[in-house]
């Protein structure tokens, strides 16, 4: 029986833990060769062991998305080695400070935007030739419901995710006539380290896990997926079209 991602090449950022780790494992289980990128070498090595244990394969890339020079070299290196990139899962991000908007320092504000927005822009620029070399390229960006709610004390994170959504939708429109499909994913509250950091009083056992989300990411990453420029909302279990003013 053919696996849904058989033979596909997938790059996953933030792959050492949480959603990225669960997605990387699920992609490998579905037949993809996973290029796992994260800052944490130990976490990547554990992921590699798990993937190999199920007969999958992975390439580990210990790197920081904030390292612009390293990210600039990544896309050409992927293209040279594999000739294409079928799946980009841009998952890595940071929460930043949870504080009144005007109490956030310029350094903190810039750091959140650099990782959550600018690093993803640089990454997309770097891997675009490899994505477009695929017969069915998929660019998937992890967003958040915070981008739409205007939550008190969440401004840096919320604004950065709103900007990421605008970037992804713009790119989806630019590539609409190509084989590339661009999707956003709102995972909702999941049992992750970032969620525990943001909501320390919450019982994590009441939340779904990254492993619950992963099969949906496999579906979006598959060659059969046809939607572009939309948001898969995991809490609702459906694809949403952003409501744009006329």
Label each PLM-derived region with a short phrase.
Residues 124, 160:
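Active-site helix of classical SDR
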Residues 144:
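Residue(s) in the substrate-gating loop at a strand-loop-helix junction
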Residues 177-180, 184-185, 192, 200-246:
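C-terminal helical subdomain
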Residues 32-46:
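Conserved glycine-rich Rossmann-like NAD(P)H-binding loop of the short-chain dehydrogenase/reductase
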Residues 99-101, 108-113:
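Substrate-binding pocket helix/loop in short-chain dehydrogenase/reductase
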Residues 129, 172-174:
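Alpha-helical segment proximal to the catalytic Tyr-Lys
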Residues 9, 16-18:
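Conserved glycine-rich cofactor-binding loop
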């Amino acid at each position: 029986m053919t696996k849904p991602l058989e033979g596909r090449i997938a790059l996953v950022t933030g792959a050492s833990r949480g959603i990225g780790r669960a997605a990387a494992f699920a992609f490998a289980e579905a037949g993809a060769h996973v290029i796992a990128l994260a800052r944490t070498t130990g976490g990547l090595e554990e992921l590699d062991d798990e993937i190999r244990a199920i007969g999958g394969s992975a390439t580990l890339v210990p790197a920081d998305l904030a390292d612009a020079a390293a990210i600039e070299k990544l896309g050409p290196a992927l293209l040279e080695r594999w000739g294409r990139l079928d799946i980009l899962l841009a998952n890595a991000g940071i929460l930043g400070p949870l504080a009144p908007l005007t109490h956030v320092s310029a350094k903190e504000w810039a750091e959140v935007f650099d990782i959550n927005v600018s690093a993803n822009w640089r990454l997309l620029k770097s891997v675009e030739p490899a994505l477009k070399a695929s017969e069915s390229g998929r660019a998937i960006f992890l967003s958040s419901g915070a981008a739409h709610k205007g939550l008190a004390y969440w401004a840096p994170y919320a604004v950065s995710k709103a900007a990421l959504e605008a970037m992804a939708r713009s790119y989806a429109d630019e590539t609409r006539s190509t084989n590339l499909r661009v999707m956003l994913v709102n995972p909702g509250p999941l049992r992750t380290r970032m969620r525990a950091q943001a909501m320390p009083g919450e019982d994590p056992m009441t939340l779904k896990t990254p492993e619950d989300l992963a099969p949906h990411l496999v579906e979006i990453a598959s060659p059969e997926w046809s939607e572009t420029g939309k948001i898969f909302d995991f809490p609702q279990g459906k694809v949403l079209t952003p409501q744009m003013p006329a």
